């Protein structure tokens, strides 16, 4: 990614302090279990280690570390029974979910040969789960429980931990980067309008405003011909260009991409929402004609770029890129009632990482429908198979909400006039899907990603403390 971020996960373990002097062998046992557990956390996150906690004071010290680090998530390993005062001081002042990991060392007891310290050390992690949740509820803390076993490995536990860490990375990306708004939303698309201060207060995402005049001149000082040539080749490697492509043909586009990449790094931008509604002449027309593929090159590198000035879909694109590896702007395009499928897609910039069915294409059109000027269109080709859609919307009080659905992309004819589009079948049927999706009140844009990701999106929503409408899965 052009702007790298790394989630910060607070990790600690708890045990009842009264057990340790009674059964001293529990000390090395718990130290070994905790060390092994920390190794299960993916290296994509920064671990803030609160240690093994057996007293209120140790719990408070862990909480101080978590607050100082501004953790995105807390993961708590339950080693054996423990009282909730070992946990609550560590999380009392945090506004992030607490994931309780109840992993038992042994798959099953050896009933006849199990003594008290063996039971406490290897078989009793489940003892306090309910107590912890009860007190997290009373403290108003969001929470989740993962139950499993250490012996023999437990892929389900590992998958859940990885999922939560992916979700935490979304929070860190929103907090540590910025959104660039260039111009303003498409006139009259009031579903896209947004209060940027409310956005920052509720979703931690700061908006930087940029004028088009700065964008027109952004490449004026780009003179490194080797960098431009390398980027031109990158463009040719990314797209099949109608009529053939050469380095010379995409030279100016490559200059802009080099400039935009530097701008993204300098301004720490992970989201772009842009729309130009002026005259497509001179330098304005030049950039406007090649902006779609130029921004597609940014999307490829992790910066979500949304057309029509849609900040909310830029966020949805970034979420899916972070958790699923791709994020493609889409909208309801058409319905094939004969086949009972929805045609979903959009014009404009897209994500090459979703285009695994074939290489993305680029062609020149004389007019961008509904917009100023003409120029290069890009079309991406999502594969047949599972697909997830995510939209972000708001209620009348400004609270955000996620709207999600899972479906399956099917083979068959698609539109070929230059816009990305796919044939999606939903379990509830096309007619019912459109009714349910629309009634949820999303913006008319959504983001798409290959695979099924609702479970991860639910974790992202838990971290952001926003509701989710699950339309179908």
Predicted features and spans:
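Short, well-structured alpha-helical segments in soluble
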Residues: 59-71, 88-90, 257-266
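Short, acidic/small-residue loops that bind anionic groups at enzyme active sites
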Residues: 89-115, 120-128, 293-308
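Long, internal scaffold/assembly segments composed of regular secondary structure
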Residues: 231-323
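C-terminal catalytic subdomain
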Residues: 296-416
